[in-house]
Amino acid sequence: MPDYFICDLSHTSQRISSEYIPYAIGCIKSYYHEHGKHDVNIHLIKYPEDLSPEFFKHKPSIVAFSNYMWNTDLGYGFAKAIKEYSPQTLIVFGSRNYPLETVRQIKWFEEHPCVDLYIIGEGEEPFKRV
């Protein structure tokens, strides 16, 4: 059974910004298990220190990141490392933190070449289609 990761990484250097799994990625996992067509193990990752060991343990075919202004660099740093090690892994970013204008969207992908797909807004239905 393939593994997918959905990450909403939280900075932990000073203190944990939230002790709970973010609601949005929990909803995506729940929706996928109810409506998805494939048997998949979906892992929710919150803490950056958990992502690397879990990645090497499970070798997921998809790694998705919630992309907010406070964790863009954190998520992209991991996305870049994952692509260097495993170019076949699909990297998905998602949230409303994405330009609306086509020209700026193209520029965003040029500045973030490790991202294969961006889901704008609610992610439940689009992630199911990935």
Enumerate the predicted regions with their spans.
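Extreme N-terminal starter segment of soluble prokaryotic enzymes
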Residues: 1-5
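Short loop/turn segments at strand-loop or loop-helix junctions that form parts
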Residues: 7-11
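Glycine- and acidic-residue-enriched helix-capping/strand-helix junction motifs
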Residues: 13-25
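N-terminal cofactor/phosphate-binding cores enriched in small/glycine residues
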Residues: 25, 31-32
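Glycine-rich beta-alpha loop elements in corrinoid/cobalamin-binding modules
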Residues: 31, 39-130
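Zn2+-dependent metallopeptidase catalytic core
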Residues: 35
